[in-house]
């Protein structure tokens, strides 16, 4: 075997020194499988529930795990229904609804806006004339309909999406119909 082939074989057999910026080290694949990490759960709602006295419900204080609690490295993320707190077992139905409302900010949701029939009629009439109203029109509508301008903007976005979806569905139904050669005559 030539000296250059021997050097190549030796390089292949020897493992390179581990780098701190290698993919394996970044992903933690170079660590042992039985490693444990110290994790403290993130529970921001335990700090903000103290403001609930004005709502009449007692605040919910979830117990914190000690910081020494360790979890195995390969973390299996629980399904959403497992991850949700099981407070239904501890509170009445009205308290549960109130608690869900208090914690809903954590999920990034705001309460759904219920438009009255009159508001929908006015918005539909404006939509027929202009489906892309400017800020001045939206602010004027907000003042007249006693709504927030951003709710009106979202209503128009949703209405345009509904119109686009219905057009697509009607085009699909037209294309789905069997071709009739008698129509060409």
UniProtKB/Swiss-Prot annotation:
Keywords, A to Z, come to:
Developmental protein, DNA-binding, Homeobox, Nucleus, Transcription, Transcription regulation
Subcellular compartments: Nucleus
Q: Induction: what does the entry report?
A: Down-regulated during embryonic stem (ES) cell differentiation.
Please indicate if the UniProt record lists Nucleotide-binding as a keyword: no
Instruction: Relate the assembly described in the record.
Output: Can form heterodimers with PROP1 in binding to DNA Interacts with TLE1.
Q: Where do the segments described as Disordered lie?
A: 32-69
Q: Which GO terms describe its biological process?
A: brain development; camera-type eye development; canonical Wnt signaling pathway; cellular response to cadmium ion; ERK1 and ERK2 cascade; forebrain development; forebrain morphogenesis; gene expression
What tissue expression does the UniProt record report for this protein?
A: High levels found in the embryonic liver, lower level expression seen in the viscera, amnion and yolk sac.
Return the annotated DNA-binding positions: 108-167
Q: What is this protein called?
A: Homeobox expressed in ES cells 1
Leader sequence segment: none
> What terms describe the molecular function in GO for this protein?
chromatin binding; DNA-binding transcription repressor activity, RNA polymerase II-specific; protein homodimerization activity; RNA polymerase II cis-regulatory region sequence-specific DNA binding; RNA polymerase II transcription regulatory region sequence-specific DNA binding; sequence-specific DNA binding; sequence-specific double-stranded DNA binding
Pfam families assigned to the protein according to its UniProt record, in alphabetical order: Homeodomain
Biological function = Required for the normal development of the forebrain, eyes and other anterior structures such as the olfactory placodes and pituitary gland. Possible transcriptional repressor. Binds to the palindromic PIII sequence, 5'-AGCTTGAGTCTAATTGAATTAACTGTAC-3'. HESX1 and PROP1 bind as heterodimers on this palindromic site, and, in vitro, HESX1 can antagonize PROP1 activation.
This protein's major location comes to nucleus
Cross-referenced InterPro entries: HD (IPR001356), Hesx1 (IPR043402), Homeobox_CS (IPR017970), Homeodomain-like_sf (IPR009057)
Annotated Gene Ontology cellular component terms: nucleus
Q: Which family does it belong to?
A: Belongs to the ANF homeobox family.
Matching entries from SMART domains are given as: HOX (SM00389)
């Amino acid at each position: 075997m030539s000296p250059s082939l021997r050097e190549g074989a030796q390089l292949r057999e020897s493992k390179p020194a581990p780098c701190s910026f290698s993919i394996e080290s970044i992903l933690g694949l170079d660590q042992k499988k039985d490693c444990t990490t110290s994790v403290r759960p993130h529970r921001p709602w335990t700090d903000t529930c103290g403001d609930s006295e004005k709502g009449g419900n007692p605040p919910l204080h979830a117990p914190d795990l000690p910081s020494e609690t360790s979890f195995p490295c390969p973390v299996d993320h629980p399904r959403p229904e497992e991850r949700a707190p099981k407070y239904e077992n501890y509170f009445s139905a009205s308290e549960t609804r109130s608690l869900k409302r208090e914690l809903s900010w954590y999920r990034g949701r705001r309460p759904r806006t219920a438009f009255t029939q009159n508001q929908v009629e006015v918005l539909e009439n404006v939509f027929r004339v202009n489906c892309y109203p400017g800020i001045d029109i939206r602010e004027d509508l907000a003042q007249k309909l006693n709504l927030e301008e951003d709710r009106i903007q979202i209503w128009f976005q949703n209405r345009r999406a509904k119109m686009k979806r219905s057009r697509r569905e009607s085009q699909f139904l037209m294309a789905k119909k069997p071709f009739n050669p008698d129509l060409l005559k």
